[in-house]
């Protein structure tokens, strides 16, 4: 999985929900998830910056895949990249299921009630078989 890459695009409405699209085999599904929160002034905060990012599965020194479940937050981590002028920006975001820690930076809602179910859903997203969480388009 370390060499796989996906493109992710984030757009937000006034309530902080991201407009998402999963493209798999030429079929498109529409969906949305909460990717930020709204402060008292009505501004979107704690969100991933709008625009296109590149998500890449990578390994950590233990050779364990980086997309692993955090026990307390019940989430997973990915590394996002995007071109900023002549350089690349890189950042990691914690992604957790709905009901975990809403409003934290980089929160992407993934519906899951327990760790095994969440892992299955993550696998489905990365395999292009689910319509949840992120705009994902597999890069060949």
Question: How would you name each of these model-derived features?
Answer:
Residues 1-105, 115-140:
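Cell wall/extracellular polymer interaction/catalysis modules
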Residues 109-110:
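Beta-rich, blade/repeat-based domains predominating
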């Amino acid at each position: 999985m370390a060499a796989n890459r996906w493109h992710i695009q984030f757009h937000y409405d006034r309530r902080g929900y991201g407009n998402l699209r999963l493209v798999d085999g030429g079929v498109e599904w529409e969906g949305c998830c909460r990717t930020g929160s709204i402060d008292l002034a009505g501004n979107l905060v704690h969100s991933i910056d709008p625009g296109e990012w590149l998500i890449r599965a990578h390994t950590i020194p233990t050779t364990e895949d980086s997309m692993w479940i955090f026990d307390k937050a019940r989430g997973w981590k990915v590394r996002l990249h995007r071109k900023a002028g002549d350089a690349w920006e890189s950042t990691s975001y914690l992604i957790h299921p709905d009901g975990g820690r809403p409003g934290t930076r980089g929160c992407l809602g993934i519906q899951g009630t327990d760790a095994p179910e969440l892992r299955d859903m993550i696998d489905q997203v990365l395999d292009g078989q689910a319509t949840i969480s992120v705009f994902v388009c597999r890069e060949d």
